Amino acid sequence: MVASRVIAVPAGQIATIVTCLEMTAPPAPVVPVKSALKLERWTAPVDLARYRALFRAIGQPWLWRGRLVMDDETLAATLNAPTLEVHVATRRDGTPQGLLELDFSGDRECELAYFGLVPELTGRGHGAWLMGHALKRAWREGIRRVWVHTCDLDHPGALTFYQRHGFRPYERLVEIYADPRASGLYPPETAPAVPLLRAET
């Protein structure tokens, strides 16, 4: 029997349980879900300010920070890499409302690196529409595995959403990192269900 462990998380840091999910074969065809949104690809060079604004609009309630902590040079290199596709769901007037990033840098695999919608569109069927486009593009010729990860800071329905679309959990991790509110990336009142513990100065 493995003894339980308690890990102390320092003030100014945050801990989350990450669940990794995968599928190793394309899901069975389904009737396409309709949406008033349209999908467009942002090709290189991606406008960094516009990208960061969308990333923040989608991810702030869930404390997304991965792209926000990158400097311009690193972010540009990441988004403009030939192995990364940035797709954006927009309203008819072109206003960005959702983000889909497909990372093909792995050997015969695709990672759904980022997937999300602005909060006011969640729970209205647009996520299923966006996932349909994601899987259609991810399962290109030669791909043997598509994977994604989510965490307990994400939308509470994220894990079951991925499972409904054919992903199978295969690994669980604990991640500890600097709280993005402590550094000013987000206001202190963001994600009130996750208390901000400031380091003493």
Predicted regions and their residues:
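Acyl-donor-binding surface of acyltransferase catalytic domains
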Residues: 1-44
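Conserved active-site alpha-helix within GNAT-family acetyltransferase domains
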Residues: 2-7, 153-172, 179
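Acidic/histidine-enriched, glycine/proline-rich intrinsically disordered or flexible terminal extensions
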Residues: 4-5, 9-16, 176-201
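Conserved glycine-rich acetyl-CoA-binding loop
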Residues: 118-132, 141, 153-157
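Conserved beta-strand-loop-alpha-helix junction that forms the acyl-donor binding cleft
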Residues: 122, 148-158, 175-181, 185
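Conserved GNAT acetyl-CoA-binding A-motif
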Residues: 138-150
